[in-house]
Amino acid sequence: MKKKIRFSLLYRDMWQSSGKYQPRAEQLTAVAPHIVEMGCFDRIETNGGAFEQVQLLYGENPNTAVREWLKPFNSAGIQTHMLERSLNGIRMYPVPADVRKLMFKVKKAQGVDIARSFCGLNDHRNLELSVKYAREAGMISQAALSITHSPVHTVDYFMGVVDRVVEYGADEICLKDMAGVGRPASLGELVRRIKKKYPGIIVQYHGHSGPGMSVASMLEVARAGADYLDVAMEPLSWGMVHPDLIAVHAVMQDAGFEVPEINMDAYMKVRSLTQEFIDDFLGYFIDPRNRQMTSLLIGSGLPGGMMGSMMADLKGVHQGINAALKAKNKPEMTEDELVVWLFREVEHIWPMMGYPPLVTPFSQYVKNVALMNIVSLVNGKERFAMIDPNTWDMLLGRAGKLPGPLAPELVELAAREGKEFYEGNPQDNYPDALDGYRKEMEDNGWPVGPDEEELFELAMHDRQYRDYKSGVAKKRFLKEIDDKHAEQSKGAPAKAAPRKLLNSPDHGIALLYSGATATFWPDEELLNVGDEVKKGDILMYLMIDKRYREVLADRDGTVRQILVKSGDRISKGDPLIEFS
């Protein structure tokens, strides 16, 4: 009897791996019936990740979007699954336990069947509450392994994580090969070991196509006993995204597996609608580089979906690096040469930083340190001269236990800066918070919604939810679309003139610089020219990878100029504020 291979369509991750935004509710409800008609999917990845947050950025209600989008799949008996980041929930930074618990209750009520939970560090302690809360809510708990390739990420290492999450009660295991750098034979051996030790556990494989190995990995894990394979479809398959259903279907069929038939008429309809969504406005936010594959990623292990933001960061520092090289009578570097240097620097520092799996947000942390190291080195400084607070939290153990040891240089640096390593449970650092958010809703006269779903959204994405309720988010999004339309009609915008400063820093003036490539959104309640500020005050917000990051004053002073305006794209190293 042939072994059956089942497919899951990654309709959410197809978009998230391609660009900034997801389809809106009316687009999703238009395409859903045709996905059902394809007749070949047992599962659909519908939400989680950045899905809910993106709806808020539109100025739309994510709860309405999730409920309406899931209805056709629930009615057809197709299982729906979401992605959540354990300690970080469905945002990019840690979430209190009571908010995490409410998330599973809300998502089950909205129609989500399966919670795929991963910890970017593979720390089983972060996964424990995800498994328990999912099961308490009546969901299927699928614990995901963050797959990467290093001397410490062996089959035995991953089996150690599997043993713990099965002990916690996980129903299924996912191999989350987020960068597509898992080696096919090793992944096959891992699945073989899981199936031998836990024959009743469902195994699902998720791989990105960027480096070019994921189809081979799919064949290996299928032969080893995997049950489900995650796939994408045109026009968003391949590139830095995922292998296409049609190719994977053909490979599995040729290998002797039983696979469902594809209704190609429905496939073409879904393909056509997806292209319409791209042509409508979503294509404005798809980085063309994400449509290309490159095996250069294998050495660094960076996920392909980072290429767009990484190239933006490189452009932000390229001129400064060449200026420093020129001042030393050294040859300037091309963009391609700088990319290769960055990849090599990632390879160099990744072991020193304890081999964190290069998945969001830890991939950004390692990439940022590598980039700032390059800036430091060309200016005659040492590596690790600039490490941001989030990266320090990872290095010190506040996000979980690193897979490998830190290099002595980093241990010594932490000691010199008076930083303490943390060995407790990361969740203990984040006390319950729902009561405070519940009071905020009462004070504003906002309903908590069915199953307290509105309360959950405020607690999970507080700033974005407030912007949605005030109407600011909708106005911001419409302006963004208008700007994109204008750019397209006029061609590429002219390069912005350098920002003019009132005075030179040599005359008692200090500047605060951006530490990342981001988009600036002002908050007039926080900062105005003439304000007196103290070191540590919140001055403004930058939006980086769909997350708002606070910009703090690094000194006492008076605001002389705000050097950026609403919606500006800020490069790493750009001046933001002028102080006296």
Question: Where is each model-derived feature located?
Answer:
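N-terminal amphipathic alpha-helix/helix-capping segment at the start of soluble metabolic enzymes
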Residues: 1-18, 66-71
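Acidic, low-complexity mobile loops and tails
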Residues: 494-541, 548-550, 556
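Conserved, mostly hydrophobic/aromatic
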Residues: 14, 117, 173, 225, ...
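C-terminal helical cap(s) of enzyme catalytic domains, especially alpha/beta-barrels
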Residues: 237-262
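Catalytic cores of alpha/beta
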Residues: 156-162, 211-227
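Glycine-rich phosphate-binding active-site loops on the catalytic face of alpha/beta enzymes
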Residues: 117, 177, 224-243
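Terminal or standalone catalytic/regulatory effector modules within metabolic enzymes
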Residues: 15, 36-54, 292-507
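Active-site beta->alpha loop and helix N-cap motifs at the rims of alpha/beta catalytic domains
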Residues: 33, 43, 48-161, 179-183
